[in-house]
Curated annotation (Swiss-Prot):
Species the sequence originates in: Pyrococcus abyssi (strain GE5 / Orsay)
Gene3D superfamilies on file: Phosphorylase Kinase, domain 1, Transferase(Phosphotransferase) domain 1
SUPFAM superfamilies on file: Protein kinase-like (PK-like)
Protein name: KEOPS complex subunit Bud32
Gene (name only): bud32
Claim: Transport is one of the keywords in the record: no
SMART domains (alphabetical): S_TKc (SM00220)
Family, as annotated: Belongs to the protein kinase superfamily. BUD32 family.
A GO cellular component annotation in the UniProt record: cytosol
Function of the molecule: Component of the KEOPS complex that is required for the formation of a threonylcarbamoyl group on adenosine at position 37 (t(6)A37) in tRNAs that read codons beginning with adenine. The complex is probably involved in the transfer of the threonylcarbamoyl moiety of threonylcarbamoyl-AMP (TC-AMP) to the N6 group of A37. Bud32 has ATPase activity in the context of the KEOPS complex and likely plays a supporting role to the catalytic subunit Kae1.
Residues noted as binding ATP in the record, renumbered to the chain: I4, K5, Q6, G7, A8, E9, A10, K11, I12, K27
EC number: 3.6.-.-, 2.7.11.1
Length: 220
């Protein structure tokens, strides 16, 4: 088992399935939520357990709604561990920049469809960036649901998409407007025109709020 990432909340390990269970030729991700020494131990334990269970439930519900996410093999609430499928492929962050424009836009539309299904399930990802999306065998997969929540409000869904737009503007700045428009078209294919208009209006509203705050800060 190899440590591949350590964040503020969790350690991420890559392991062979056979290391944990029985002989089977696949790899798995082992996500361990780490203790916070600054927290009261009882509160820390409660929070880590709640977040471990919530993430596993979110992944299960997302899959039920047809979202491409890792399959969960095990949830260990004693050690705060989730064992899940390793999605082997190429991150969209790098892949999109190598594809011809027509192919990029097709992938972006599929990203939108996947987000639409996720929001239909009453889930917001909380960290939608092309770094958390992987293309495997022609399918777009979402990973890293550590910040995800059960939330079906238009505000939360608008924030989810707004964060993706900002991330695309930063990473894919030369063509992000065309790309994000395709994301919205894919989203509308799943959720319908009425919800599409509602989400576009919410994204504009969120952007205006952000600009107002920036102007207020500058004039202070």
């Amino acid at each position: 088992m190899k440590l591949i990432k350590q964040g503020a909340e969790a350690k991420i390990y890559l392991a062979e399935f056979s290391e944990l269970y029985f002989d089977y030729p696949i790899k798995v991700i082992v996500k361990e939520r780490i203790k916070k020494r600054y927290r009261i131990p009882e509160i820390d334990l409660k929070l880590r357990k709640e977040r471990t269970i919530r993430e596993a439930r979110i992944l299960r519900r997302a899959k039920e709604f047809g979202v491409n996410v890792p399959y969960v093999f095990e949830v260990d609430t004693k050690n705060m561990i989730i064992v899940m499928e390793y999605i082997e492929g190429e991150r969209l962050k790098e892949l999109l920049e190598k594809l011809p424009m027509e192919e990029r836009l097709k992938v972006c539309r599929e990203v939108g469809r996947q987000i639409g299904k996720l929001h239909e399930a009453g889930i917001v990802h909380g960290d939608l960036t092309t770094s958390n999306m992987i293309l495997r065998e022609g399918k777009v997969y979402f990973i890293d649901f550590g910040l995800a929540e059960f939330d079906d409000t238009i505000e939360a869904q608008g924030v989810d998409l707004h964060l993706l737009k900002r991330a695309m503007e930063s990473t894919h700045y030369k063509w992000f407007e065309r790309g994000f428009e395709e994301v919205l078209k894919g989203y509308i294919e799943i959720r319908g025109e009425d919800k599409g208009r509602e989400i576009r209006e919410k994204i504009r509203e969120i952007e205006l709020r952000g600009r107002y705050r920036e102007r207020s800060w500058i004039t202070q």
